[in-house]
């Protein structure tokens, strides 16, 4: 307010908090619209434009009927598969399925006698409980790959590395260098 008791106008250099509340809102909105126009954007008119015009021709609004619809609730498994596919996690989820659901993928009998240990770059390492089972799994290798491909898709597991039970050995680790030959080990 100035000294005469008049209300300040938008052209006056008065502070914003001296304006009545609706004038302040209108002035702020006008400034925002002007800034949008300066950036080359369409500021729109908000609700002042009225409701959207009614469409006379064209497709009518479809209400959900008694049959299945895309708006119906979806199973959680389908939603997680879609999310994994959208985010690019499908390969990792498939690898986890092979390792986590081994008995459903290959069958209960094989799962009782063989355990997957690692899956690196498409090579699945499987440890059998006996050398006989390791030999049997090597014979069935193509059938196992077909079962795995049917469960999780092609290309997830490209080959199998089947090993028997670990026998006692002096070697440590998967790679080794030849030693100096036989020595007197036991005193």
Swiss-Prot record:
Domain of life: Bacteria
Compositionally biased tracts (Basic and acidic residues): 14-30
Pfam families per record: DciA
UniProt-listed InterPro entries: DciA-like (IPR007922), UPF0232_actinobac (IPR023007)
Start-end of Gly residues biased regions: 1-12
Annotated stretches, region: Disordered: 1-77, 166-187
Signal peptide limits: none
Family to which this protein belongs: Belongs to the UPF0232 family.
Family annotation (NCBIfam families): PRK03195.1
Protein name: UPF0232 protein MUL_0004
Organism, as annotated: Mycobacterium ulcerans (strain Agy99)
């Amino acid at each position: 307010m100035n000294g005469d008791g008049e209300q300040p106008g938008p052209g006056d250099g008065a502070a914003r908090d001296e304006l009545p509340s609706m004038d302040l809102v209108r002035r702020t909105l006008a400034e925002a619209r002007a800034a949008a126009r300066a950036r080359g954007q369409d500021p729109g008119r908000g609700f002042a434009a009225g409701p959207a015009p009614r469409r006379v021709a064209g497709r009518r609004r479809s209400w959900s009927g008694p049959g299945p619809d895309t708006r119906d609730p979806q199973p959680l498994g389908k939603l997680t598969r879609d999310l994994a596919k959208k985010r690019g996690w499908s390969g990792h989820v498939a690898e986890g399925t092979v390792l986590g659901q081994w008995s459903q993928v290959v069958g209960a009998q094989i799962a009782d006698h063989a355990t997957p240990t690692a899956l690196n770059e498409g090579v699945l390492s499987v440890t059998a409980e006996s050398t006989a089972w390791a030999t049997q799994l090597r014979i069935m290798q193509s059938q196992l790959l077909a079962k795995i491909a049917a469960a999780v898709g092609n290309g997830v597991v490209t080959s199998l590395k089947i090993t028997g039970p670990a026998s006692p050995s002096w070697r440590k680790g998967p790679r080794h260098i030849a030693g100096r030959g036989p020595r007197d080990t036991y005193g």
